[in-house]
Amino acid sequence: MTNQLFDAYFTAPAMREIFSDRGRLQGMLDFEAALARAEAAAGLVPHSAVAAIEAACKAERYDVGALANAIATAGNSAIPLVKALGKVIASGVPEAERYVHLGATSQDAMDTGLVLQLRDALDLIEADLGKLADTLSQQALKHADTPMVGRTWLQHATPVTLGMKLAGVLGALTRHRQRLQELGPPCWCCSSGGASGSLAALGSKAMPVAEALAEQLKLSLPEQPWHTQRDRLVEFASVLGLVAGSLGKFGRDVSLLMQTEAGEVFEPSAPGKGGSSTMPHKRNPVGAAVLIGAATRVPGLVSTLFAAMPQEHERSLGLWHAEWETLPDICCLVSGALRQAQVIAEGIEVDAARMRRNLDLTQGLVLAEAVSIVLARTLGRDRAHHLLEQCCQRAVAEQRHLRAVLGDDPQVSAELSAEELD
């Protein structure tokens, strides 16, 4: 659900506009206008009525508050909107009112309107993903040789580079872009099945009208009615769930690297950003929090859509209703995470000197694997691994650098010269 206090933080303005109350109404009204044009082409609606219907299909002409109250009684948003649309038309061209919503059902208007919104949402998400991918690519190249410690199980492991970490995020987002592109037109289907999805109301004109409607709205014509077959919507939401998860991983890593004990990278600073109400020294990862928050919420929302798939017969009771706010919320959360990820990627501040100090924090232990691999050539893997494990334990216990411990060990010295150890 939208919330004025938090929308600016968690969502992007352009996505909020797509799924605003006016945006939702306009999607359904676009369906009604296109339906009138399609039916006029099939000889079911006089061309003189089309202009009146089109003129009335402007969301700004309708009272959102009044419609909201009516929805609470009607059970869906299309019923009161179609009634209001008819009244507006009747006030100007009374004879055109009878042709409004001809042969359609509420779910046709709502589902098609939603698909139009989702298509716009996808355009926005794809554009933001492309921009973020370009930025991450530039930063990965810039930091291809910026060494830092790799961490496994939250412990220092072996050296990596910041460029490698950023390239990993880039790779995931590139795969998600491909997944979204593969959804393509088949995912964006209009709905024109009528009351029970059988197209019965329009008789022999039903298919020509359905084809013309799809063409008018630049949507695909489904093979069958999909009032209770929701797999396309769930597939789209699932890919957005993957996007949210990968952005959350990016945000999680950034936030961990911003910890005082690490201090290796930082979100870009700005006046008033990331401060504390009580601690003047704080620099909180407020952007990363949005990424992690979206990655936490979106999977639950996607699971709601999966749970809503076994819809009853030809129109569902409650399961369809569960989608109405869920899909927009997913899109809004992903858009907000993409916006914050772009800010982080563009302005990320890197403390390369701190990275180097952290590499040295364990006094050479991060290079133990490299020594073990070299020794394995002559000692065998298991023996070399055990030997290095003992040397590492001794280095920690004696608080000495691993290089010094290795140099003192007779088994190591027998295999590697001082120059090779260096």
Curated annotation (Swiss-Prot):
EC number: 5.5.1.2
GO biological process: 3,4-dihydroxybenzoate catabolic process; beta-ketoadipate pathway
Record's keyword terms, sorted: Aromatic hydrocarbons catabolism, Cytoplasm, Isomerase
Reactions accelerated catalytically: 2-(carboxymethyl)-5-oxo-2,5-dihydro-2-furoate = 3-carboxy-cis,cis-muconate + H(+)
Disulfide bonds: none
Record-level Gene Ontology MF annotations: 3-carboxy-cis,cis-muconate cycloisomerase activity; lyase activity
Key word Cytoplasm present: yes
Family per record: Belongs to the class-II fumarase/aspartase family.
PANTHER family assigned to the protein according to its UniProt record, in alphabetical order: ADENYLOSUCCINATE LYASE (PTHR43172), ADENYLOSUCCINATE LYASE C-TERMINAL DOMAIN-CONTAINING PROTEIN (PTHR43172:SF2)
NCBIfam families: PRK09053.1 (NF006554), protocat_pcaB (TIGR02426)
Protein name from the UniProt record: 3-carboxy-cis,cis-muconate cycloisomerase
The species this protein was found in: Pseudomonas putida (Arthrobacter siderocapsulatus)
